[in-house]
Curated annotation (Swiss-Prot):
InterPro entries: Ankyrin_rpt (IPR002110), Ankyrin_rpt-contain_sf (IPR036770), Dendritic_Spine_Reg/Scaffold (IPR050889), TPR-like_helical_dom_sf (IPR011990), TPR_rpt (IPR019734)
Organism per entry: Homo sapiens (Human)
Predominant place of localization: other
TPR repeats: 1289-1322, 1336-1369, 1371-1403
Keyword Acetylation appears in the UniProt entry: yes
Phosphoprotein keyword on record: yes
Processing and modification events after translation: Phosphorylated; by MINK1 and TNIK upon stimulation by RAP2A.
TM spans (from-to): none
Disordered, as annotated region: 1-46, 63-99, 206-225, 257-311, 439-486, 1421-1485, 1636-1696
Protein name: Protein TANC1
Biased composition (Low complexity): 461-480, 1421-1431, 1467-1485, 1659-1689
One GO term (biological process): visual learning
């Protein structure tokens, strides 16, 4: 018969795995008939194929009803343990993560990940291999479960988790616990599974609900311990938040099978539809859609689903990694039937309802802790809470009384039904957790008729006075106030005050095991604390420090709940409070029903009350507890330092009396039905009501529950008072329940039909759904099963007793009713007593008949129910077989995972001894390896935890004594280390090897010594050790003793050391001996660990202070290295030498300095330690401190006189070593104290080079600031280090900016060009962006310099290059326009300005210049017409007043002009700063900021750049060589001053606008302000060579050069220039072009760079003058002479080329009016103006091609057509006719210097100072031979000067827009 029962549908089950249809069919098999079950009519389930059937067909395992949705974690479910093991605190190593089956776990997550996209928050390095989000989520969960840290950014938001879980589960994985064991996934029934039960086969194998203790188990039953290990509840679904499936349109998907309602409970967590199915769900059962694409399959339950796995039931469940957080999901958000619908209650912590297969992108890490979701069934929509104000007031006073020793909390004590739960619920409802409380309709037996929609929201209104209700009833219904407003106010204040302090709460419910377990309590409280708005800082901390979340993971809570609560909750909260991140107020945690938790007391471990007693002393004083407990359980809280408040002293306490009266009055007055039923004649007056009220209150004895149920009977008309004796009124709760049952079950047979249901509900460890109960009932039938409709009728009859909760599970209406069904007091009527044993039997049969394997949890639960059912009682005599063997056969036939269940996490840490014995009898392997303590065998784990009874059981069944974990430790080692003396004795008596060594070479004796267990050590010495020579893996006793001495000394166990030193001769140890394990003496070990007491003890026993350890280190060095100065003092007092040196020549001072122990250093110096001692490497104490970066020690040693320039054997100073380490502050300190910054060691390295080599960015910046020079080694070391390289380049630019600011244009240009040469060509990828920005800045700065030296062609070219990099830069267009205007290319300038205006229409400066240029274009046309008629003076602009008066000196003119320009346009002059937007992470923004700070004060911005190729050069070639003529100073002044007036104001206003309005990047420091350009633009440029053609055929070159080269230089670029978005590249190009160009400009280009400052009106007629061959102006068109027309700097406008090439010096000056403004600053740094104007005039056809010398950035004067060294096109090079290429740098230097007239002072003075008499006709004759001669003479001088100008920096102040237009 047993076999028939067990094997029924076994075949079907197995087949079911393969064939979807072979589920339970109508076929019947013999079934055991249990007591009452036989009466139930039998009906077989139809075979309709629907989702229901599918789920069964797939072999879904069924477990006890936990939540209907209880997803069952097949194999994955872990059992949780309730209690902390008694063993010593485990080290982290013991908490190692169990192994996870790879494929099972990872594959599903891979799938899940596909649809997800990482959130933008998860910024990943592009090159980093990135794992899929799913994989990350998996890792995160693994981290939690395993107790490890969580990978950052892998957290899934609670909402998304839900959906992710769905998918993951369908793959067969428990979303919450990737750790669990073998089979991957919880079944759909598992709380962590959001799928239908039909989803996965593996899931079916194990049901999460394995429980052992029945809810009805009494406290003395040890089996109940198993319950403690249970972790799942009907709330699981709630917890997982995914109990419901939603269709696309948002409707619930419900599947029905044969009338069975499959609608799973809606997500209680869903914000909206939580309560959805209250009424309508049943009527509307839309067909469940299960399209794959739609997401998780709709949940459909078949009969099998009735047996859903209840998540964690008995202790041993998951293979787990216990972390089946999912099953917790449900739980944690398990409904609080108390109408408390907390905010997170919507869908498990806020999960999104729609579980379509959409995956939201992963969000940044979130809290993965989930609170249990509580639901108190007896709280109904009509419950009211009246009174109790006195109680709240009293609690408040007591908690606020700081003098009270018992103010750590309050205990509310009361009998059953006295309103304890209502009080807690009221506080929760008004707290931060009750803002979205939802009233849950309940059908409690006495609840008064409902007049409102049961699902309506009823909020606790803070305005109401708290109304009291029965213990289970507290709702928001507003009581009609029976208390006056005055009295109400202060009372309300008390309840509000307390509620405002509530940060967490917990309800213990006996019929929901999880709520009674310590691990769940810890985890849930932590989760609620995170959600409390007062503790937002705690939440932030958990997000920031994932290891804290890991510490609070369920797995950690099971293994050591005390440590988890202390380290994960109390310590972080205390620290936050100390840091003032938590408001300085008091906070409260509420716990209801501690007595209920006692019902599930485990064999080992704490109950909730003992746990609180153990941990309360660790609570901070500001965190209080308010707990409730039943009066007959007061002893469990007797040790708590709490104030006790009783609700029991009914007759004496007037407040209680008034509360009860107020409640009755309220109910009577609010219901006409009650009024009419309590009055004899239908008319009730106040007297009558008062009498009835007094009678009821008297009968109640203080019980609100009694009053509520009695008044409900009056309200429904079941009771009517017919006489004044009130005999009809029941006198007790027991009578009330009897009356209700009699009304419900008119006959005994009616009750017997319902009895099996009650039995199952009583036996179950968790609330069960109707489907689960249905499965259990039918499991007891062999033939004809009960029909669903019949079953539903019975359930309807019981609906007032078994309240349906939000998750569709059923819970007893009140704990007292549950107890009444099981137990009656003597003399009470025994009608309606139930037999939970039969319920256990039905549940056991349900598990036995379940298809597929049971998981660990289900197996434990099955064992629990088998033991509780005890169906073989009395059969042993008949059969001859003991009942225990029959039970073992039963469980053996029913499941295969006995060993895994035995070793499940909960069963290890809170073992259920009886169920474990049953599992072992059934065949479980007692040597099975666990997932903890390095995969130790079960015996090792239990020995470590000190579970003596379990160890005895394992040894009884033959567990291997010498089985080891992976680290080689045996059970004896674990027991000795943990200090379990009884187990050590037990194991040694059984014959375990005492001398066994683990993999670290330690035996049990050493383990006991390390942890200070002297008694065990002495006991082990008395045991028998292996005789003879030690075998491999064993140890001699003498060696073990020496090791034990070292071990005890190192850990400071002085008692053990004393014991060992006092051993008799047989066991004598050598006090100076070195052990064979660590090689330490006892003294070196103690000194190194800072154990002062032990050191003194050892020295007292004759330990030698000079005795070294195996490595030759004496005790003094051990102590100094670890900073234990007290021990150093002790050793010095015992005769040690303070300057003792070791083998390397190091002294204790060096060792202490090296380790950074300042106090020890100070102590040693005070004792005479030599500061100047050097070790064998030549390093001093200061050197060591610098090398290790200990700044405080460095400062102290320097102050004490340490030599700061001491070099070691390699020539390194402390500064070198500090630069190597990388502490910038130490480096700065040493430099300030006089360290030589340019010191070179023996290998040729300087401190800067070392810092660069080690990539110590902050040190590099610090040294550069202090003036470190950049040598070849520095650049070599910076190669391939973009972050360092950009710092060096910025340093060069900074130096150039300083030069520019000082007016040294030549030196500035050299710096800029040198920087350009150092730019990396490629290879940095993203890191190139900051380089490109910097390059743009340099180009703009160079363009600025060129215009300052009147080299307009080059200026134009540089601006063009900036434009290539940043095509949308209006500043670049503006700059190029200025250059073109200066070279009189008005049309091209006009085009550029128009572009600039388009890009920045609001810039006034640009508009002003545009208007001026338009006017000048008109003037030019007029002047050309006049020129045809004859040489006439050029018409004057209104803004340009030119005079004919000759000006005596050039230098004055320039001086004044320059000054004026600087004054008027400081912004314009500021050198373009480095781009501020630094996209590349490699360049520290702080550095750029620092550099810019230095650059931002002085200097002028550079003019904007324009596009190349806009204007053709207007200049014509000069036919004949001649002397270089310079216009007079006045003539030049005239030109400058013409537009100063209008320009100045514009500069000031415009400059700021430019910066603001520039849409591209921020300004760059120095001559050219550059707006950031899009990355990516590139241009090719050759930095080393340039071809200069000086031929007339190159007119178009000017167009190409565009902006910066007004001089018609032809800069043939070897490659086409491609403007790209990248700022830096272009800059680089521009700079390199310019740099080379400047340096290489050949003499033959001496295009008449006359004082091109003179601004000419449109037509400049030369008033032919003495012997000048032609008096008409020649527009040098960038051809042979490349004359840079009379335009010099940005400050003045160039109307056209002013320079004329004449054969003779022109002596007369054209007259014209001009304003002369004095100039005080040297122009381009050159006071002698002649240099600026010397024009180079070489044979027109020669072209020079010279590599520009690095660093020689010369400024071309008078725009003498410099040609960019980067030839743009070879064809252009040919134009000149000659391809003479300069061969050497000297030539380039020469040409550059010549080119920059500013450099050749001699030339300037001797050959070029030729005054120009007529401004209009200022004609300079360039004499080529003189020029060549001067060039050759000046070459060396120039190159030297160039090098000198290398280092200097300037600070830019304003944007580069030029104002003197």
């Amino acid at each position: 018969m047993l076999k028939a029962v067990l094997k029924k549908s076994r075949e079907g089950g197995k087949g079911g795995k393969k064939e979807a249809g072979s589920d339970f069919g109508p076929e019947t098999s013999p079934v055991l008939h249990l007591d009452h079950s036989a009466d139930s009519p039998v009906s077989s389930l139809p075979t309709a194929e629907d989702t229901y059937r599918v789920s069964l067909a797939k072999g879904v395992s069924m477990s006890l009803p936990s939540s209907p949705l209880l997803p069952r974690q097949s194999h994955l479910v872990q059992s949780r343990v309730n209690k902390k093991s008694p063993g010593p605190v485990r080290k982290p190593k013991y908490v190692e993560s169990p192994r996870v089956p790879g494929d099972a776990v990872i594959m599903p997550f891979r799938e899940v990940a596909k649809p997800t996209e990482p959130d933008e928050h998860e910024a990943k390095a592009d090159n980093e291999p990135s794992c899929s989000p799913a994989a990350q989520e998996l890792l995160t969960r693994l981290g939690f479960l395993l107790g490890e840290g969580i990978p950052s950014a892998t957290h899934i938001t609670i909402e998304d988790k839900n959906e992710t879980m769905c998918t993951a589960l369908s793959q067969g994985i428990s979303p919450c616990s990737t750790l669990t064991s073998s089979t991957a996934s919880p079944s759909t029934d598992s709380p962590c599974s959001t799928l239908n039960s039909c989803v996965s086969k593996t899931a079916a194998n194990k049901s999460p609900c394995e429980t052992i203790s029945s809810p009805s188990s009494t406290l003395e039953s040890k089996d109940s311990g198993i319950i403690a290990t249970i972790t799942s509840s009907s709330e699981n679904d709630d917890r997982s938040g995914s109990s419901l499936e939603w269709n696309k349109d948002g409707n619930l998907r419900l599947g029905v099978q044969k009338g069975v309602l499959h609608d799973r409970r809606a997500d209680n967590c869903s914000p909206v539809a939580e309560e959805e199915t209250t009424g309508s769900a049943e009527s509307t059962l839309p067909k469940a859609e299960s399209s794959a694409g739609d997401g998780p399959v709709p949940y459909s339950q078949g009969s099998s689903s009735l047996i859903m796995p209840r998540p964690n039931s008995v202790a041993a469940t998951s293979s787990t990694k216990l972390e089946d957080l999912s099953y917790l999901d449900g739980q944690r958000n398990a409904p609080l039937r108390t109408s408390i619908r907390l905010p997170w209650h919507n869908t498990a912590g806020g999960r999104a309802q729609e579980v379509k297969a959409r995956f939201a992108p992963y969000k940044p890490q979130d809290i993965l802790l989930k609170p249990l979701l509580f639901e108190v069934p007896s709280i109904t929509t009509d419950s009211v809470f009246v009174g109790r104000d006195w109680l709240f007031h009293q609690i408040e006073e007591n908690l606020r009384n700081t003098e009270l020793a018992e103010n750590r909390g309050a205990v509310v004590v009361g009998n059953v039904g006295f309103g304890k739960t209502a009080i807690i619920s009221k506080l929760v409802a008004l707290s931060c957790h009750g803002s979205r409380m939802r009233q849950i309709a309940s059908n409690s037996p006495g609840s008064s008729p409902k007049t409102s929609d049961p699902t309506q929201d009823l909020h606790f209104t803070p305005l109401l006075s708290p109304s009291s209700s029965t213990s289970a009833s507290s709702t928001a219904k507003t009581p009609l106030g029976s208390i006056s407003a005055e009295n109400q106010r202060p009372r309300e204040d008390a309840v509000k005050y307390l509620a405002s302090k509530v940060v967490a709460y917990h309800y213990c419910q006996a019929d929901n095991t999880y709520t009674c377990l310590v691990p769940e309590f810890v985890h849930s409280i932590a989760a609620l604390l995170c959600r409390s708005h007062q503790l937002a800082a705690y939440r932030d901390l958990l997000i920031k420090e994932p290891q804290l979340q890991s510490m609070l993971s369920l797995r950690s809570c099971v293994q050591d709940p005390v440590a988890a609560f202390k380290r994960g909750v109390l310590e972080p909260l205390t620290n936050l409070r100390n840091e003032q991140k938590i408001p300085e107020e008091e906070y409260i945690i509420l716990i209801d029903g501690l007595n209920e938790a006692e019902f599930h007391k485990p064999d080992y471990g704490d109950t909730l009350s003992s746990f609180i007693t153990k941990i309360i002393s660790k609570f901070p004083a500001w965190l209080k507890l308010i707990v409730t407990v039943r009066a007959n359980f007061q002893e469990i809280i007797s040790a708590l330092p709490f104030v006790k408040l009783s609700l029991d002293d009914f007759p004496d306490n007037k407040d209680i009396h008034s509360d009860l009266h107020a409640y009755v009055q309220h109910r009577v007055h609010s219901s006409q039905d009650i009024l009419s039923n309590i009055s004899l004649n239908g008319k009730a007056d106040a007297t009558l009501i008062g009498k009835v009220s007094s009678h009821l209150v008297l009968r109640s004895l203080g019980s609100y529950l009694y009053l509520k149920l009695t008044l409900d009977l009056f309200q429904r008309g079941h009771l009517v008072i017919k006489s004044a004796s009130y005999k009809v009124v029941p006198v007790s709760l027991s009578e009330l329940y009897l009356l209700q049952c009699n009304m419900k079950f008119m006959t005994q047979s009616a009750f017997e039909r319902a009895l099996p249901i009650l039995n199952v509900a009583l036996a179950s460890l968790h609330p069960m759904t109707d489907e689960q109960i249905f499965q259990a009932i039918n499991a007891g039938h062999i033939q004809g099963e009960q029909g669903w409709e019949d079953f539903q009728q019975r359930m309807d009859a019981l609906s007032c007793f078994l309240i349906k909760r939000r998750d569709k599970t059923r819970m007893f209406c009140h704990p007292s009713f549950r107890e009444w069904l099981v137990w009656r007091a003597d003399g009470e009527n025994t009608a309606f007593l139930c037999e939970p044993r039969n319920g256990h039997a039905l549940l056991a049969f349900m598990f036995s008949r379940q298809e597929g394997k049971l998981n660990r949890q289900q197996t434990m639960e099955l064992g629990h129910h088998i033991l509780k059912a005890h169906i073989f009682k009395g059969l042993s005599k008949k059969t001859g077989i003991s009942s225990s063997h029959l039970q073992a056969l039963w469980i053996g036939y029913s499941t295969e995972g006995l060993s895994a269940a035995l070793a499940s996490l909960r069963n290890l840490y809170t073992p259920n001894v009886k169920v474990s014995r049953l599992l072992i009898l059934g065949g479980a392997n007692v040597n099975y390896r666990t997932e903890v303590l390095n995969n130790a065998p079960i015996l090792c784990v239990q020995s470590h935890l000190g579970h003596e009874e379990v160890v005895t059981l394992l040894l009884e069944f033959g567990a291997c004594l010498d089985g080891t974990s992976e680290n080689g430790m045996t059970a004896l080692c674990y027991a000795a280390a943990a200090g379990h003396m009884k187990l050590v004795c037990l194991l040694t008596k059984k014959g375990v090897r005492v001398d066994h060594l683990d993999k670290k070479g330690q035996c049990a004796l050493v383990h006991s010594a390390l942890r200070g267990h002297g008694d065990i050590l002495q006991y082990l010495l008395t045991c028998e050790w292996s005789p003879g020579p030690p075998q491999p893996g064993t140890l001699r006793k003498s060696h073990a003793l020496q090791q034990a001495l070292t071990a005890a000394a190192s850990m400071g166990h002085s008692s053990v050391v004393q014991c060992l030193l006092g051993m008799e001769k047989e066991h004598e140890v050598e006090v100076n001996g070195t052990d064979t394990l660590w090689g330490e003496t006892a003294l070196t070990a103690a000194a190194g660990r800072g154990k002062l007491e032990v050191c003194e003890l050892l020295l007292g026993h004759g330990a030698a202070v000079s005795r070294t350890n195996r490595r030759g280190v004496p005790p003094l060095f051990c102590a100094a290295r670890q900073g234990h100065w007290q021990i150093v003092r002790l050793l010095l007092e015992r005769g040690c030498d303070v300057n003792l040196s070791d083998k390397q020549g190091r002294t204790p001072l060096m060792v202490a300095a090296c380790e950074g122990h300042l106090s020890t250093v100070e102590f040693l110096l005070s004792k005479g330690a030599a500061l100047s001692s050097l070790d064998k490497e030549g390093l001093s104490a200061l050197s060591w401190a610098c090398l290790k970066g200990h700044r405080a020690v460095v400062q102290y040693l320097v102050e004490e006189g340490a030599a700061i320039d001491q070099t070691d054997k390699n020539g390194r100073t402390p500064l070198d070593l500090a630069a190597f380490y990388g502490d910038a502050e130490t480096v700065l300190y040493l430099v300030e104290k006089g360290a030589v910054i340019e010191h070179v060691d023996h290998s040729g390295m300087r401190p800067l080079d070392r810092a660069i080599g080690c990539r110590n960015t902050s040190v590099v910046v610090a040294l550069l600031r202090k003036g470190a020079k950049l040598g070849n080694a520095a650049w070599a070391m910076a190669t391939s280090k973009p972050d360092i390289l950009i710092i060096l380049l910025q340093k060069l630019m900074e130096e150039g900016n300083v030069m520019y600011k000082k007016g040294k244009m030549k030196e500035a240009a050299q710096r800029y060009q040198y920087a350009l040469r150092k730019f990396p060509r490629e290879g940095f990828g993203e890191d190139m962006r900051p380089f490109n920005e910097l390059r743009v800045s340099l180009y703009l700065n160079l363009s600025r310099c060129r215009r300052k030296t009147n080299d307009f062609g080059m200026a134009e070219e540089f601006a063009s290059k900036a434009l290539e990099l940043k095509p949308k830069s209006y500043e670049a267009f503006y700059a190029r326009a200025r250059a073109k205007r200066n070279s009189r290319q008005f049309v091209a300038a006009l085009a550029d300005l128009q572009e600039a205006v388009k890009l920045c229409p609001t810039n006034q400066e640009v508009k002003r210049l545009l208007a001026r240029v338009e006017e000048e274009c008109k003037q030019l046309q007029r002047s050309q017409q006049q020129k045809q008629q004859g040489p006439l003076p050029a018409p004057l602009n209104d803004s340009e007043n030119e005079e004919d008066t000759p000006t005596p000196g050039l230098s004055d003119h320039f001086h004044s002009e320059e000054t004026e320009e600087e004054e008027t346009s400081p912004q314009e002059e500021s050198v373009s700063p480095t781009p501020r937007s630094q996209p590349s992470s490699s360049v520290p923004s702080s550095y750029i900021r620092n550099l810019q700070e230095g650059l931002q004060s002085k200097g002028r911005p550079v003019s904007p750049q324009s596009r190349a190729g806009i204007g053709k050069s207007l200049r014509e070639p000069v036919a004949q060589p001649g002397l270089l003529l310079q216009p007079s100073k006045q003539a030049q002044i005239v030109k400058t001053s013409q537009h100063l007036g209008s320009g100045q104001s514009a500069v000031r206003n415009g400059s700021m606008k430019v910066q603001i309005s520039s849409q591209n990047p921020p300004p760059s420091p120095m001559p050219g302000r550059i707006a950031a350009t899009p990355a990516g633009s590139r241009t090719q440029h050759l930095e080393g060579t340039g071809t200069f053609t000086t031929r007339a055929g190159c007119g178009h070159f000017g167009d190409r050069l565009g902006p910066s080269q007004n001089v018609r230089l032809q800069c043939g670029e070897n490659g086409p220039a491609h403007p790209l978005p990248s700022k830096t590249k272009t800059t680089e190009r521009l700079l390199s072009h310019s740099s080379v160009a400047v340096d290489a400009a050949p003499p033959n280009q001496g295009g008449l760079a006359t004082c091109s400052d003179v601004r000419h009106p449109a037509s400049l007629t030369s008033s032919g003058s003495s012997g000048s061959p032609s008096s008409s102006i020649k527009m040098s068109s960038s051809t042979s002479s490349l004359t840079s027309s009379s335009s010099f700097s940005d400050g003045f406008k160039v109307q056209g080329p002013d320079t004329r090439i004449k054969d003779k010096v022109v002596t007369h000056v054209q007259s014209g009016t001009a304003e002369h403004r004095p100039r005080n600053t040297p122009f381009m740094g050159i006071m002698d103006k002649t240099a600026r104007f010397q024009q180079q005039s070489n044979p027109p056809s020669r072209s020079w091609h010279c590599p520009a010398p690095e660093g020689l950035l010369t400024n071309t004067s008078s725009a003498a057509g410099l040609q960019s060294a980067n030839t743009e096109k070879p064809s252009l090079m040919q134009v000149g006719g000659y391809n003479n290429q300069a061969k050497t740098c000297s030539v380039s230097t020469l040409s550059a210097s010549v080119h920059n007239g500013a450099q050749v002072k001699e030339l300037e003075e001797s050959k070029c100072q030729i005054p120009v008499h007529s401004q209009e006709n200022r004609i300079t004759k360039t004499v080529s031979h003189l020029y060549q001669e001067s060039i050759s003479k000046q070459q060396p001088h120039i190159s030297n000067e160039a090098h000198r100008s290398h280092l200097t920096a300037a600070k830019p102040k304003r944007s580069f827009i030029e104002s003197n237009v």
